Amino acid sequence: MEKVEASMHGWAQAPYGTKAQVDANYKRMLHYGCMPDNARYVQFGVASHNLFDLCYAMLLREREGVRDQVEFEMLEGMANHQARVIRQAAEGLLLYAPVVLKEDFHSAIAYLVRRLDENTSEENFLHDLFGMTPGSRSWEVQKKRFLKACQEKDEVKYGPNRTQNRAADPIQPSHYRDAFANERDTDWSLRQNAEWINGMIAAEKEKSGEEIPLVIDGEEITTNLWGVGRDPSRHNEVSYKFAYADFDQVEHALVTADRARSSWASKSIGESAEILHRAAQELSRIRGEAIAAMVRDAGKAPTEADVEVSEAIDFCRYYAEGLDRDGMNDGVEMSPLGTICVMSPWNFPFAIPTGGVAAALMAGNAVVFKPSELAVYTAWQIVQAFWRA
């Protein structure tokens, strides 16, 4: 699961990457737990079916004088003969067993099968236990692994593998013909990222009363027709105002787009792609502001808004490379449609319109953007990022 999670979100894997690292850290933890200054505050349980580790812990607790604070734990139904010997040698053993109602007995079997599957993987001690004797090949393999872990216990890295910091990490630029890679989502398990977005949302809550104009031919236009945007969490309050377009202004926008499309369509694939890559970089730069805008404008949870920003960035980079893949131009002549109107919904106010705008622009079209009237403030963040690009 950890591998899947890391791969899906573009994060470092949270646990160690190899069994050897896990084994070395286990020895480090044994030493830490058996230190008298630590052991006196807890009842320290050593859970394992590895005889090398169990015996190592027995010797360690005797050496450190913490016998009463360190106990041993094993699973019922798995190497019971080994458990009996450990119980006698350690003068006690905590034995775990699943307890279920009779009609749920299959759940207990599933639990034990899962444990058995984990513990009998090729590198695990139980994999070799039943055919192992001192001096045998499997014994020597396990002995070598144990000694290697002991040697590396003070060298193995400990602490979080994930260090993402949205407040400090630099924005990673991308360029035309770079290999596509999904934008990394925000790792909300990290305190610094939670503090970062809390600050963004707090700053957004201080804003109110903005007036969002129409923008046609580079000119900001206000009208006598105003709509109001509301924060779903404070629905009785007007959060901001936005200008409606009348029929003449709609016509003006279409004429402007028609006039601009030939200039835009004349750009090469590489030129258009670089602009979309710059747009992706701008969207990445305003991730925090965009998340806070969606929280204010659409009632999105930060976790939901964050993946929208990632998807929007991915759209820009993906479409930037879409017309230059192998085979795309073999015997095909492509031409723009002309002017595309992108009309976006309220429930995905960031990713969907960004994808529509990016795809239309990359195909050489002019774009008229008409967002949902329930998410105009979010759309305002998007268009400004594209204009800066």
Name these PLM-found stretches.
Residues 1-179:
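Positively charged, amphipathic and often flexible ligand-engagement surfaces
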Residues 295, 316, 321-389:
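Rossmann-like NAD(P) dinucleotide-binding subdomain of oxidoreductase/dehydrogenase enzymes
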Residues 16-24, 45-48, 73-74, 245-248, ...:
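Alpha-helix capping and helix-loop boundary segments enriched in small/acidic/polar residues
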Residues 43-49, 73-75, 96-98, 119, ...:
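Generic beta-strand/beta-sheet core signal
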Residues 1-3, 51-56, 62, 78-83, ...:
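Flexible loop/turn segments at secondary-structure boundaries
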Residues 36-40, 60-70, 89, 265, ...:
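Secondary-structure transition/capping motifs at alpha-helix termini
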Residues 284-290:
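Extended, amphipathic, non-transmembrane alpha-helical segments
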Residues 91, 102-255, 259-262, 266-281, ...:
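Terminal low-complexity tails and localization/encapsulation signals of metabolic enzymes
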